[in-house]
Amino acid sequence: MLSRRIIPCLDVRNGRVVKGVKFHDHIDMGDIVELALRYRAQGADELVFYDIGASPEGRSVDYTWVERVARLIDIPFCVAGGIGDVETARAVLHAGADKISINSPALGRPQLISELADAFGVQCVVVGIDSIREDDGQWRVRRYTGDPSKTQALPMRTLDWVAEAQRLGAGEIVLNCMDNDGVRRGYDIAQLRQVRALCHVPLIASGGAGEMQHFADVFDQADVDGALAASVFHSGAIPIPELKQFLRAQQIEVRDGQ
């Protein structure tokens, strides 16, 4: 196993970083570039930026802030939001992103995954999956979660979509466990373990980090390749250098800070 990755997630709306709870009630957390520079200095392994309004609003990501981030940081970063075709993806990568992530557009047209993988290589193509547990006990996917008024429940089971996304060429899966998002009670280990059993590409856990032990738990118990978090990093509740020191003490291999 390679070193586990620590990945701050920055949800972007109207050019600012925001954060909600279970994808609702977003509040302003700060400037995109300022936060990106802070995380780079703290030793984040990479960054993920979600333009959360892009897909619900039927537009592509704003390239201007992608270019600003690319000029100032030297760690890998991934961009998501309204990337619905090869040309849009090319523009985002040309602006400086290392990877692109697709979610709602891929649910609407799964072949997009293959088109992007063919154009740029699977290493550039991340598929984000917003998943929630329904009353029958099954996890199913949601679309357009960046706007609660437009969020759609789909009949597709999360596990089936993970398998299909890999078949089509996804190079990495980010599983956003919506039930756990922003509540800081830990990652959804049960769901992540089921996904891990059939996921043969890097798997990133998202949703639920509240304390350092939660990161250790998700690495040890769900065998994920990376852990993504937002509110605990934005608020300063968990400083990344201290987190990495804690994980090393738990015999979990992480990269040294920058």
Curated annotation (Swiss-Prot):
It comes from the Bacteria. It catalyses: 5-[(5-phospho-1-deoxy-D-ribulos-1-ylimino)methylamino]-1-(5-phospho-beta-D-ribosyl)imidazole-4-carboxamide + L-glutamine = D-erythro-1-(imidazol-4-yl)glycerol 3-phosphate + 5-amino-1-(5-phospho-beta-D-ribosyl)imidazole-4-carboxamide + L-glutamate + H(+). InterPro entries: Aldolase_TIM, His_biosynth, HisF, IGPS_HisA/HisF, RibuloseP-bd_barrel. The active site is at residues 11, 130. One of its GO terms (cellular component) is cytoplasm. Keywords: Amino-acid biosynthesis, Cytoplasm, Histidine biosynthesis, Lyase. It holds the Pfam family His_biosynth. Gene3D superfamilies: Aldolase class I. It is found in: Cytoplasm. Disulfide bonds: none annotated. Coiled coil: none annotated. HAMAP family: HisF. Heterodimer of HisH and HisF. Belongs to the HisA/HisF family. IGPS catalyzes the conversion of PRFAR and glutamine to IGP, AICAR and glutamate. The HisF subunit catalyzes the cyclization activity that produces IGP and AICAR from PRFAR using the ammonia provided by the HisH subunit. This is Imidazole glycerol phosphate synthase subunit HisF. It comes from Xanthomonas oryzae pv. oryzae (strain KACC10331 / KXO85). The gene is hisF.
